[in-house]
């Protein structure tokens, strides 16, 4: 199989995603039943972190171990990357010593340059522009709870950040719709959305974006790297909290998701994230299973 990277959601086809989602279901079932599943024995994952992480590191490191392989954690500050080694050189070296690489960094250009010089698959663990692994887990979580996501409506309330851009790509792949509501000054960057993407609609009022939605989702108002804007963002995002009133505008059985960590009382009310419509803990756990399926696919291809 030719090298396949997962740098943004659109890097895989619908057929590939359907395979990975089915493998996620099987792998999760095996995990719950304590059935050994070790397809990646003697394989090594290198995890490169320029941004801090809890869920990404845990899910990839535990996942690779559960698949029978090994995971190496490498913080850029502890490597030559932190001392100015060119990304291209680091990619050439690392990819000769492992089987797959996951990178969590700032600019998408960094991971694109790395992948262009890598001899093994590269996975985007998060960049400022995209968070495809999280949305893969989110789509699986929706399917797990509600069945097919095709034709459904997802409401995105809050910042036009990496999560939103991955959701918009997912909407094109899986053929669903995204209602987007962001405050003035924090709107979608058109350069990060495909020109032919007709699977979303913009709303000025967040409550209107929630109307009829099958899933309501949000993220923190201040992402990593934008901490100096926090005070201005708190003011600008006033009114964009996902609360019970907004959830009532959605479908009666609508789900709520958040990629975490969450700030109760800011982007989401405690009554929502801790309420019966919230599936955030399943969503977080499914990072583990979805990424195991992704690792398996990118290293081994489709299993017969």
Swiss-Prot record:
GO terms for cellular component: cytoplasm. Pathway: Amino-acid biosynthesis; L-arginine biosynthesis; L-arginine from L-ornithine and carbamoyl phosphate: step 1/3. Its EC number is 2.1.3.3. Gene3D superfamilies: Aspartate/ornithine carbamoyltransferase. Reversibly catalyzes the transfer of the carbamoyl group from carbamoyl phosphate (CP) to the N(epsilon) atom of ornithine (ORN) to produce L-citrulline. It holds the Pfam family OTCace_N. The keyword Cytoplasm applies. It catalyses: carbamoyl phosphate + L-ornithine = L-citrulline + phosphate + H(+). HAMAP family: OTCase. Belongs to the aspartate/ornithine carbamoyltransferase superfamily. OTCase family. L-ornithine binds at residues 162, 219, 223-224. One of its GO terms (molecular function) is ornithine carbamoyltransferase activity. The keyword Cytoplasm applies. GO terms for biological process: arginine biosynthetic process via ornithine; citrulline biosynthetic process; L-arginine biosynthetic process. It is an enzyme of class 2 (transferase). Carbamoyl phosphate binds at residues 53-56, 80, 104, 131-134, 259-260, 287. SUPFAM superfamilies: Aspartate/ornithine carbamoyltransferase. It is found in: Cytoplasm. This is Ornithine carbamoyltransferase. It comes from Herminiimonas arsenicoxydans. Keywords: Amino-acid biosynthesis, Arginine biosynthesis, Cytoplasm, Transferase. NCBIfam families: orni_carb_tr, PRK00779.1.
């Amino acid at each position: 199989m030719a090298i396949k990277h997962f740098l943004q959601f659109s890097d895989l086809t619908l057929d590939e995603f359907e395979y990975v989602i089915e493998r996620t279901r099987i792998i999760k079932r095996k995990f719950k039943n304590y059935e050994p599943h070790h397809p990646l024995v003697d394989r090594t994952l290198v995890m490169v972190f320029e941004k801090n992480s809890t869920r990404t590191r845990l899910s990839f490191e535990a996942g690779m171990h559960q698949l029978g392989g090994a995971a190496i954690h490498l913080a850029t500050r502890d490597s030559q990357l932190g001392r100015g080694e060119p990304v291209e050189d680091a990619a050439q070296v690392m990819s000769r010593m492992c089987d797959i690489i996951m990178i969590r960094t700032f600019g998408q250009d960094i991971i694109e340059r790395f992948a262009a010089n890598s001899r093994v698959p590269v996975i985007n663990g998060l960049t400022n522009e995209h968070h495809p692994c999280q949305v893969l887990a989110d789509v699986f979580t929706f399917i797990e709870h509600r069945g097919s996501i095709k034709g459904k409506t997802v409401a995105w309330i809050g910042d036009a950040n990496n999560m939103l851009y991955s959701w918009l790509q997912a909407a094109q792949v899986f053929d669903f719709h995204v209602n987007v509501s962001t405050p003035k000054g924090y709107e979608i960057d058109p350069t990060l959305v495909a020109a032919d993407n007709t699977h979303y609609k913009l709303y000025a009022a967040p409550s209107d974006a929630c109307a009829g939605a099958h899933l309501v989702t949000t993220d923190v108002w201040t992402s990593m790297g934008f901490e100096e804007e926090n005070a201005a963002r708190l003011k600008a995002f006033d009114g964009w909290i996902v609360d019970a009133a907004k959830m009532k505008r959605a479908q009666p059985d609508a789900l709520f998701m958040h990629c975490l960590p969450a700030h109760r009382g800011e982007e989401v009310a405690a009554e929502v994230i801790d309420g019966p419509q919230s599936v955030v803990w399943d969503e977080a756990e499914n990072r583990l299973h979805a990424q195991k399926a992704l690792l398996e696919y990118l290293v081994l291809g489709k299993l017969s």
